[in-house]
Amino acid sequence: MTSYKELGLVNTREMFKKAVAGGYAIPAFNFNTMEQMQAIVQAAVETKSPVIMQVSKGARAYANGTILRYMAQGAVEYAKELGCEKPEIVLHLDHGDSFEICKECIDNGFSSVMIDGSHLSFEENIALTKKVVDYAHQYDVTVEAELGVLAGVEDEVSAAESHYTQPGEVIEFATRTGCDSLAISIGTSHGAYKFTPAQCTKDPETGLLVPPPLAFDILAEIEKKLPGFPIVLHGSSSVPQEEVATINKFGGALPNAIGIPEEQLRKAAKSAVCKINIDSDSRLAMTAAIRQHFAEHPDHFDPRQYLKPARENMKKMYIHKIVEVLGSNGHLG
């Protein structure tokens, strides 16, 4: 067994406590590649922000769990090389769907895991979550649970409809499971197509689609039930229209891709929401830069030539999210 502490990683307990008290949210960025890891670390160091590096089941299948673990260890050392004496980096399993996968990640150096039992009945979700919590807490690994279902498709996570979290269930769920944080459903959605055009209104000035607002009334009720308890938002990419436009300009086909408006995420970050997950925006930033590079340099074939601008574009996006949306900059240590 490898402890996350041997890798220089931290769990989420203290950083969430500080985030809730400070009215900001910790960025949780998914990564699959070295370039994503480098961009995340560079952005976190430059903004003096704690950061959560997330690995989905699909990422583990693509890049191998052991390799990703050592990439996370490398991220800690890389942050130090960049001048950060005490980086606060979490290696988190995103959407673990079984006790076995959570245990495997805990045993392999992950400092935080999510057990997603949201597709189960209330009692089954409690039982599965508690089983993971009981194992994880033996090794000081923190556990995120989920109550409510997000719509959308991203990696292996798929649901046709969302089911909002019921505030009346959260006290019993948190108490009986002992989870450290709770992912809720208040209108966010996985993927780059978070809403259909029929669900949106059209801005008369810009002509852009405007998605429906998040259910902040449900969030407020949950905060009343669980004061100070760490809340998590999944599916929170904003799907920047400039990146979508670049992709479409250079041969892509992403019609009506739409995300969560950043002003709504800013509002959420000032509440008990202390972790906000962002994945699709990174994919869009990477894809836009690569498509543009090949259009402008059709003779290039060295991966470094097109992955370098992709890395820079992702870093720019990560810094924007940290500083302008989540407010976690300057909160390291």
Language-model features: locations:
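An acidic- and aromatic-residue-enriched active-site/binding cleft used to recognize and process polar
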Residues: 148, 236, 281
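Alpha/beta enzyme core
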Residues: 10-21, 34-59, 65-86, 95-230, ...
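Generic N-terminal amphipathic, Lys/Arg-enriched alpha-helix
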Residues: 1-27, 300-301
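A short N-terminal beta->alpha junction/helix N-cap motif
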Residues: 3, 24-32, 59, 305, ...
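Short catalytic/ligand-gating loop segments at beta-alpha or beta-beta junctions
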Residues: 233-239
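C-terminal alpha-helical cap/extension of soluble enzyme domains
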Residues: 2, 248-249, 260-333
